[in-house]
Amino acid sequence: MKYNTGAGTVPEQLNVHLVPHSHDDVGWLKTVDQYYVGSENYIQEACVENVLDSVVMSLQRDPNRKFVFGEMAFFHRWWLEQTPETKELXXKLVKAGQLEFVNGGWCMHDEATTHYIDMIDHTTLGHRFLQEQFNKIPRAGWQIDPFGHSAVQGYLLGAELGFDSVHFARIDYQDREKRKGEKSLEVVWRGSKTFGSSAQIFANAFPGHYGPPNGFNFEVRNNFVPLQDDPRLFDTNVEERVQNFLDAALTQAKLTRTNHLMWTMGDDFQYQYAESWFKQMDKLLHHVNKDGRVNALYSTPSLYTEAKNAANQTWPLKIDDYFPYADGRNAYWTGFYTSRXXXXXXXXMLSGYYLATRHSGFFAGKKSTKYHAFDLADALGIAQHHDAVSGTAKQHTTNDYAKRLALGASKAEAVVSSSLACLTSKQSADQCSAPASAFSQCHLFNISYCPPTESSLPDDKSLVVVVYNPLGWSRNEIVRIPVNDANLVVKDSSGNKLEVQYVEMDDVTANLRSFYVKXXXXXXXXXXXXYWSLFKASVPPLGWSTYFISEATGKGTRNALTLSQKGETLNIGPGDLKMSFSSLTGQLKRMYNSKTGVDLPIQQNYLWYESSEGDFSDYQASGAYLFRPNGQPPPHTVSRSSVTRVTRGPLVDEVHQKFNSWISQVTRLYKDKDHAEIEFTIGPIPTDDGVGKEVITRMTSTMATNKEFYTDSNGRDFLKRVRDYREDWPLEVTQPVAGNYYPLNLGLYTKDEKSEFSVLVDRATGGASIKDGEVELMLHRRTLRDDGRGVGEPLDEQVCMNKEYTCEGLTVRGNYYLSIHKPAGGSRWRRTTGQEIYSPMLLAFTQENMENWKSSHSTKAYAMDPNYSLPPSVALITLEELDDGLVLLRLAHLYEPSEDAEYSTLTKVELKKLFATQKLEELREVSLSANQEKSEMKKMKWSVEGDNEQEPQAVRGGPVSNADFVVELGPMEIRTFLLQF
């Protein structure tokens, strides 16, 4: 029988848009490759290769059928395997609109634990692939599964990509119920305070899950009722199934505005045998439309959005974001903000490294670097998936993510070493394909393992340290390397001796090194280095400086003192910022900045929440996704005193504190920095008492913060948070702690009439202000129960060694940064230091005679004009030579309009000075993901409830002339260009 499947929309009828899709996690219960090929099906029956093979065959059987697909990590794998004939068929399906790409990034990224640069990078990777292969531009965001939605997603990874709409399933259960009653599930979302309506997007929150209505899931092995319309067979049920369809459609129609509603026809890894779905949908379309009471059609998110837009309906306005997300009274998805804190650190560190890899590769010239950054791009793209960086995959899958990142990092390291060898060499670029110098780098600095700096030097050679600065402004920072000798001389490239400070290696680091080098390198390391050697490096913007370390003649003296202080108070800090600690307990008592006069009484401690295992009223446990502390008692204080050791020196003062056998920290105050750097070491978290533990650090001040604090959105905008409050609905407070946690990628701050207190983080984590004047960060978690959201494992990370599998819980080491300012005075520190944390200086090492090196190498150089640096309000967030020879450039303004009187203004970047050593021929401005001309981007107009159009006009930079190449950037603006040299 030939079915009529060609219906379009009908103006006067209820239109049910069937959107066939398969939700394909880029790793979760299985690894990305296991999901692709369909191995390990005892874990989960899932094979994405089958989905794509099967869908393509089904689509060609009927030109009216449609299907949407999002994850380019999978599609790219599939595409590389296809014959020319299959590629031609797929290209026809895409051109005809039957196969539509949604999102189009490498994965469906998480929105809580991702950094905006990573979100842009993987989306660009996918979008440029689609443009090259199909000349197609995705129009719809499809974030159906992430656990809450960010403001940056709404405006930056939405409107600025050229998306008309974004579609998702997960919003807070209280929010959803209110919106159902008001028909406000679908909204116009203005995620940016800065850009308002100029960066708005239509946001469609589904009435429930991202699957079809009950009874309409047609996966081949599901127990569904087929539509039976062959009169020669028993049990025909056309009328019954049409009525079922009608009932479900009319029920959903009560929740939406206009006569259009969407059915998401698919679920996790479905369409393994696509014909099972399409046969049933063909029959439904035919018989429902023949019945005539509603109209049903094959559709896609972009067609659905066009229909909504054409209806001339007025829509509710949504601002800010959709965090935190809860799907039940005791089920706040705020644990994953911190889950697998070490994996989140690796992703953050390699994100900054990937940025520097592409910079240095460009400046050295692609031919000279044997460019291999794709493996790291692929691994980082996969790592942004909403079960990867979020820490919610099974352990074996998490191991696979880590392996991919390590392999990608290894390839990128070769690019950086080769680039630096070429850049520092005095050979011409074309001679540099085989650079003479071989550099090595160190990945395990944080546990003091760096073989190049620990090995003894031959008599006539120095340790050559090349320090590369990936930022667009000059930096003066302390370089810290492990050494075995406190009798070293450090010289700069002019031969000047630098001041060196030595700090004795602490036992905590030595023990970590002994265990983790063995675990990571599968071989025992030599005994820990005896000291940290510290000196100040001065490095030009996007340039490098060279330092030479040699052994001094004669006996050396250590110019750092370890003190036991007399009196009640320990005062430390060689610069403007001072901290006072109790001599008796080691507790922090106050922070004081002698330059600004800000004085803040403040305490800091470590505590842990007991993970709930569920109770008689609700069996919900705390786990990888959810944070549910056990009952309402306050968290357990780890210790009210610490074993404290103070080291003072000309460059840095350090306070080493041990709170118990598994928590310690070092507080560092540098002479030239306005902040305290706190390095924490937590683990193994003990569980022999049968209790899961979620460890926080808490800073308690006297500030009157009125329930308010501010957290970043994906490292970009800061959003105001109010404890126990939601903008969009009257909140019933069921979890006073977990329900007030928010995701951090940059940091958070609080303020009152006297001062502003800021905390920055080095990785994605969760943070809160549970009482006025308090700030807490969750730093590490270890739970003993699964939380029932599908992963099927407790969050119990362990490190195992040797054949006997000696295992212990994972130890996490990381940094956070504290600073105090006058009211409204902290933004400059937050923005600048945030960039320095994201893009640390890169160190590369080799051994050579100092004079020989200086005669054959450039020891200090600039990629840009030596008298120029980027404005302090601008970051270079992408500089990459593409395969077609064009160069991708992205510049980001770092400030919101009212953040800083001087820097929150229109600013200019002179590209001729940025690229002083190369001749820039022309540039084209493109969309954020570089897949379309900026001038050709079209925006849908939406009517918004209560919109009086009184919002301030967003400031954006003007056109760039191909004569002077000056780029203007307004506050929070990101501009993307393709350059031709």
Curated annotation (Swiss-Prot):
User: Which cofactors, by name?
Assistant: Zn(2+)
Thermal dependence, as annotated: Retains 50% activity after 5 min at 70 degrees Celsius. Retains full activity after 5 min at 70 degrees Celsius but is completely inactive after 5 min at 80 degrees Celsius. Retains 100%, 50% and <10% activity after 2 hours at 40, 55 and 70 degrees Celsius, respectively.
Residues annotated as binding Zn(2+) are 23, 25, 145, 386
Q: Which GO terms describe its biological process?
A: mannose metabolic process
Q: Could you state what the record's PTM comment says about this protein?
A: Produced as a precursor which is then proteolytically cleaved into a 66kD heavy subunit and a 44kD light subunit. Cleavage probably occurs in protein bodies/protein storage vacuoles.
Annotated keywords: Disulfide bond, Glycoprotein, Glycosidase, Hydrolase, Metal-binding, Vacuole, Zinc
What's an example GO cellular component term for this entry?
Answer: protein storage vacuole
Write the Enzyme Commission number(s) for this entry.
3.2.1.24
Disulfides per UniProt: 422-432, 442-450, 800-807
pH dependence text: Optimum pH is 4-5. Activity is stable between pH 4.0 and pH 7.0 in the presence of Zn(2+). Activity is stable between pH 6.0 and pH 8.5, decreases below pH 5.5 at 25 degrees Celsius. Activity is lost at pH 3 and lower, rapidly diminishes at pH 7-10 but is higher and longest at pH 11-12.
Q: In this chain's numbering, which residues are marked as the site (Cleavage)? A: 562-563
Where does this protein reside within or beyond the cell?
Protein storage vacuole
Cofactor: how and how many bound: Binds 1 zinc ion per subunit.
**What reaction does this enzyme carry out catalytically?**
Hydrolysis of terminal, non-reducing alpha-D-mannose residues in alpha-D-mannosides
* Activity regulation, short description: Inhibited by 2,3,4,6-tetra-O-acetyl-5-fluoro-beta-L-gulopyranosyl fluoride which acts as a slow substrate, doubling as a competitive inhibitor as it forms a high steady state concentration of glycosyl-enzyme intermediate that blocks the active site. Inhibited by 2,3,4,6-tetra-O-acetyl-5-fluoro-alpha-D-mannopyranosyl fluoride which also acts as a slow substrate but no intermediates accumulate. Inhibited by EDTA. Inhibited by metal ion Cu(2+). Inhibited by metal ions Fe(2+), Cd(2+) and Co(2+). Inhibited by metal ions Ag(+) and Hg(2+).
SUPFAM superfamilies documented for this protein: Families 57/38 glycoside transferase middle domain (SSF88688), Galactose mutarotase-like (SSF74650), Glycoside hydrolase/deacetylase (SSF88713)
Q: Does the keyword Transmembrane helix apply?
A: no
Glycosylation annotated at which residues?
Answer: 312, 446
User: Is Zinc one of the keywords?
Assistant: yes
Region: Disordered, residue numbers: 938-957
**Gene Ontology MF term list:** alpha-mannosidase activity; carbohydrate binding; metal ion binding
Catalytic residues as annotated in Swiss-Prot or TrEMBL: 145
The protein's role, per its UniProt record: Liberates mannose from p-nitrophenyl-alpha-D-mannoside. Liberates mannose from further alpha-D-mannosides including methyl-, benzyl-alpha-D-mannoside, 1-6-linked di-, tri- and tetrasaccharides of alpha-D-mannose and mannosyl-rhamnose. Liberates mannose from various glycoproteins like ovalbumin and ovomucoid. Does not hydrolyze beta-D-mannosides. Has glycosyltransferase activity, forming disaccharides from mannose and lyxose but not from glucose, galactose, ribose, xylose or arabinose.
The record's note on quaternary structure and interaction partners says: Dimer of dimers of heavy and light subunits.
Family assignment from sequence similarity: Belongs to the glycosyl hydrolase 38 family.
Please state what the protein is called: Alpha-mannosidase
| Native organism | Canavalia ensiformis (Jack bean)
